[in-house]
Amino acid sequence: MIFDKEDYKAFDPELWNAIDAEAERQQNNIELIASENVVSKAVMAAQGTLLTNKYAEGYPGKRYYGGTAVIDVVETLAIERAKKLFGVKFANVQPHSGSQANAAVYMSLIQPGDTVMGMDLSAGGHLTHGAPVSFSGKTYNFVSYNVDKESELLDYDAILAQAKEVRPKLIVAGASAYSRIIDFAKFREIADAVGAYLMVDMAHIAGLVASGHHPSPVPYAHVTTTTTHKTLRGPRGGLILTDDEDIAKKLNSAVFPGLQGGPLEHVIAAKAVALKEALDPAFKEYGENVIKNAAAMADVFNQHPDFRVISGGTNNHLFLVDVTKVVENGKVAQNVLEEVNITLNKNSIPYEQLSPFKTSGIRVGSPAITSRGMGEAESRQIAEWMVEALENHDKPEVLERIRGDVKVLTDAFPLY
């Protein structure tokens, strides 16, 4: 806008070279990390504006600084678009991240030491759903629910029985590595049965909810949180939604001044852009293709008996694969695939026996390749390369050939 690329490169070549190298890496890699995506140029342009110069503590119409009339317009656009997209009465667009959005909900609805139920990390939950190393596990008495050991699916009857036993004040639904549809209506029934609040963290599936390809939690949850990146394809940040006016007031106070100071209005502008993009009819096609591409990749792994797809498949943007019959652990698999320029992450699987630094599985996601325009045929080919690379992880000539094939594919689907 004011400082163009060449000026920046001349001023700080070391940093620009690093950014340039990352741009090259993203172009030449197949990105399968389920929490990553490819934002539009419009999102990047908004985030790079001089809105970053402005302090705007407070909320539209109630700021602690002067000169915020234009900022109020920007933030209100983001709020109204979020409300329209998800069909909700109240939205807070200020959280800097999904973790901070979750923290704001906890601060609003419960007290330190209160009992909360959240999904076990190895079953697909998130750090902020009660992991001992997280603020959530340190501040509140989290009790983890799990998936059924045989089906690897959520067992709602078992969760209800557990809730009746521990009597939580809050139940957290949502996941970072669960490949099936979550029944939010069932979760609300469970919460009501024990007099608990229901919070849904839809960070991973928000884009699919927006596109109509996953049931919305909004009609059932007292509060819904999400990130604005991942499947929603916006900038990194958080978002909180509710239909309850009293809860909305508590949430606003928890975000500011409870957890944060000045909001990042340049990021909020980028959120507004992403929300407008998600309101476009074309986003429905994107959501459909994300699911088709994930299913196509999972199907390939299901055809190779040495790999085990957790729960047998996927209904969303990701799936997990147990790789321990082929390589030592998930970390080894991640490293092998990175050698052929396919990027994903090691991931724990239900009832994990290995440490989180090694894991038995990998997590595979389709949002980024779908944003690049790849379809089911490309997705199947990518999965075949993954299988071949892992089965031949000790054969450099095979890995070199696959790396060349990957380059041909990424050249055909430019990042921008």
Curated annotation (Swiss-Prot):
N6-(pyridoxal phosphate)lysine: modified positions: 230
Subcellular location(s) per record: Cytoplasm
Enzyme class: transferase
Main localization of the protein described in the UniProt heading: cytoplasm
Alphabetic keyword roster: Amino-acid biosynthesis, Cytoplasm, One-carbon metabolism, Pyridoxal phosphate, Transferase
Co-factor requirement: pyridoxal 5'-phosphate
Example of a GO biological process term: glycine biosynthetic process from serine
Pathway terms, separated by semicolons: One-carbon metabolism; tetrahydrofolate interconversion; Amino-acid biosynthesis; glycine biosynthesis; glycine from L-serine: step 1/1
Catalysed reaction, written as an equation: (6R)-5,10-methylene-5,6,7,8-tetrahydrofolate + glycine + H2O = (6S)-5,6,7,8-tetrahydrofolate + L-serine
Record-listed (6S)-5,6,7,8-tetrahydrofolate binding positions: 121, 125-127, 355-357
Described function: Catalyzes the reversible interconversion of serine and glycine with tetrahydrofolate (THF) serving as the one-carbon carrier. This reaction serves as the major source of one-carbon groups required for the biosynthesis of purines, thymidylate, methionine, and other important biomolecules. Also exhibits THF-independent aldolase activity toward beta-hydroxyamino acids, producing glycine and aldehydes, via a retro-aldol mechanism.
Family the UniProt entry places it in: Belongs to the SHMT family.
Protein name listed in UniProt: Serine hydroxymethyltransferase
